[in-house]
């Protein structure tokens, strides 16, 4: 299964509550924080919610 590195590039301040909670669920708390997640439909849906706040890169397992 592919892995995704998700990096927060913009603040969640000023966003909707749903966007802020999605960042927290992804494990992102500060700008430039990164987390590695599996490439799953649930994660892709969360990324779609905050696509303007994060950068996504595929990494080797």
Swiss-Prot record:
It holds the Pfam family Ribosomal_L30. CDD domains: Ribosomal_L30 (cd01658). GO terms for cellular component: cytosolic large ribosomal subunit. Gene3D superfamilies: Ribosomal protein L30, ferredoxin-like fold domain (3.30.1390.20). One of its GO terms (molecular function) is structural constituent of ribosome. GO terms for biological process: translation. Belongs to the universal ribosomal protein uL30 family. NCBIfam families: rpmD_bact. Part of the 50S ribosomal subunit. This is Large ribosomal subunit protein uL30. The gene is rpmD.
